[in-house]
UniProtKB/Swiss-Prot annotation:
Homodimer. GO terms for molecular function: ATP binding; protein homodimerization activity; protein serine kinase activity; protein serine/threonine kinase activity. CDD domains: STKc_STK10. Residues 331-343, 364-373, 429-443 have a biased composition (Polar residues). It is an enzyme of class 2 (transferase). The modification Phosphoserine is found at S483, S487, S491. It is a peripheral membrane protein. ATP binds at L42, G43, D44, G45, A46, F47, G48, K49, V50, K65. It comes from Xenopus tropicalis. May act as a polo kinase kinase by mediating phosphorylation of plk1/plx1 and subsequent activation of plk1/plx1 during oocyte maturation. It comes from the Eukaryota. This is Serine/threonine-protein kinase 10. Its EC number is 2.7.11.1.
Amino acid sequence: MAFANFRRILRLPNFEKKRLREYEHVRRDLDPNQVWEIIGELGDGAFGKVYKAKNKETGILAAAKVIETKNEEELEDYMVEIEILATCNHHFIVKLLGSYYWEGKLWIMIEFCPGGAVDAIMLELDRGLKEPEIRTICRQMLEGLTYLHSMKMIHRDLKAGNVLLTLDGDIKLADFGVSAKNVKTLQRRDSFIGTPYWMAPEVVMCETMKDAPYDYKADIWSLGITLIEMAQIEPPHHELNPMRVLLKIAKSEPPTLSSPSKWSPEFHNFLKTALDKNPETRPSAAQLLEHPFVKKVSGNKPLRDLVAEAKAEVLDEIEENGEVEEEEASDTPSSNKSVSQSALGEKDKHTGKEHVGNGIKAEPQNTDSQADIHSQKRNHEGKNYPEHNRHDAVNGKPDIIILNPVSSNHEPKRNSAAESYRNEEHGSAVSSNQRPKSSQSDRQSVELVPNGSFDSPTRYFTGWSKRDSDSGSNSASESMDISMNLSADLSINKETGSLSLRESRLHKKTLKRTRRFVVDGVEVSITTSKIIGDDEKKDEEMRFLRRQELRELRLLQKEEHRNQAQLTSKHSFQMEQMLRRFEQEMNSKRKFYDSELEALERHQKQQIERMEQEHALRRRDEARRIRTEQERDHVKFLEQLKLRKKELKAQVEKLPRQQRRDAMKVQMDDFAQKKHIEEQQFLNKQKEDLTLALRVIVLENRKEIYNKEREFLNKKQQLLRDREAVIWDLEERHLQERHQLVKQQLKDQYFLQRHELLRKHEKEQEQMQRYNQRMMEQLKLRQQQERARLPKNQKAEAKTRMTMFKKSLHISPSGSAAEQREKIKQFSLQEEKRQKAERLQQQQKHEHQLLEMQAECDCNVRDLLQMQNEKCHLLVEHETQKLKTLDEHHIQMIREWRENLRPRKKALEDELEHKKEEQEMFFRMNEEVAGHPFPSNKPAKFYSFSSPEAS
């Protein structure tokens, strides 16, 4: 103790405080760089980067999650993930290969999955998954979830991005960063955590109301949303802001597939069953394993084929459309449009066939060795951004799959491979023995050229490349059918002032992508074509910004979870401290009254012993005094007897001598006999008097002791009453203090919720401001491009119109040359007026667009503020209701406590009265025993009594 004070004075470091907490699965004594070699970067997560690592000894690959921590407290946030990974041992859950904490960085080494995440595969293939693939993934996910839930764990962040694929066609559930490890299977949680689009309604409600916690069935809802995501590339409500989607989930009906006809009834029924807003009726993972949608799934061939397609070699071929020559456009007859497009389509067909043939060595003569299969078209109804829908009309359709056997041994497998890649949307496929038809019409729909341009497109080849899905690369969307009116190529929309479809395609490129891979020994080649433009960059930018928003939300959730955990820990400590103080106060009061009772009993014992000693002395003195008096009386009595004897002798002496002797003898005998009788009677009387006197003394002593015992008993009972009264007061005060503490903790809880909600609202407003600013910038950029293109287009159109006007004058001449020049001059003036009107109309349209966009942005802000105010108001209502319920519960507890206090008081008084009766009965029995002629040797209950003189 002295050394501690000395150390405090000298401000020496406290080594006990710096003692680091040891974790079971985290090594602090080893540099991970000595064991693992970083060979690449896989991605950037919300809390750190993920690297591809290789074990220097075993060569095992791992995904290294490297997280920088500022202090030891942050390290605690990741322990649940490490413990879950270390505890779980299942075929469909990633394994923990090791974890290290070195130089302020936490390294989590996780099993590497070469197939990558499912969402990355969908972006790479630019399509959603087919139903057989979804069935297989769903089956494996359900088995993994069944194991997780049996281990009392909730994933809480199920989505396609957290489902990894191996080369063997198996899935691995990953990312347990926000998972919960429970003590009981049915344990509920109230943390608002996860990714909004995949959140269950009961999890969403926990943002403002903690009264309805959720359990493991929240994962079932996330599973259903993940299946929709895999079918449609994006989850439901993906077009909404991550914060605003929460309100949609809570208030709207469960989502469904956007194209019901594409999917089987079993799939629809499975989603309807899993996406039940009532968690009580929502089935568990084990129950869903018996659903017809996944019950008959056997094997993982669809996933093996999917991974093979995603990991295929890719040849990207970019065709850039040239500018339109104004002179050619004006001089070319309209009848040449179809000719030019047809010729170009035939040329492109041969060009494409040449490159595909070089890539896969196709033999056109062998009709049995190739098949042309149109893969399913991507559904853009739920596309993320409205700009995509504008360009759906210019995307091409053809997807070509060419199957070539690697050797003659694989000839029987051609048909099965073709069947596995049949068109899921239409339910049909071209058989392998059919000759592919000319793709001229399809190519025409893809590679349209502007009217009047006879120049062939410039081609760019990016070459074969190996694409890893886990690298997060995004590919372009598949081609779509188009229908357009070529006669409007040179026109300008009078209503909107926008450029024609032809002009919008002048600066676009056509991407033709060929994927080549092997399935069951059969080499498969898939070719897709699409029109790409600036919107591709916009889509990628919007996707990146959306991921950034989700990352910001994830960071907010993590910090909120940490603050919530700290507050919960603080509240638990406060409650434990208060209960400990209550116990100490109670024990202190009890100890005080127990010591008072002990002191009173000691004083009682001493007092009784002193009284008994005094009584013994008094009885002995009184007995001695009585005996002394009795001895004096006895001497006097003997003296009297002697006098009587002398008198008797004197009387006998008076008799004659002859009678004197006989008379003396008779008289003496008679006197001796009387003397003996009288003396015996006298002694007996003295003895009785002594016994009576001593008995009176004993009774007086006992009465005095009884009074003293009653006095002490009253004092004891008063102490007991005081002790119980103090205990009751303490109990009531403790109930009050406990209520005040719980009430204050509830206020602190809601204060933290309001604080976190305001932080979320600030982040929402910041994101909304960025979104509105981005929309305004895009609109201004588009308007600037339109303004820049308008003069050029007007010039080209004016030249064309002037040429046509001159030709009309030349065909039907009327008037002199001067009149024709005047007409041409008037036509030029009209063209200038028309162009000026077009410019004015465009300016007005742009101003109107800006006003509309500004109004839309303001409306978005108002809607956001209204939604935020509703959340705040709802939170305040919940707090008020919770406080009211808490007060009512406290009043009820006080009422019940007081009702229970009455029988406790009555029981105490009955017990005290019973003790009084026992004491009275005890002394009454002693008095009765004392009334017998023989002395009682029965020991006293309240005091000991011994008198040698009384015996």
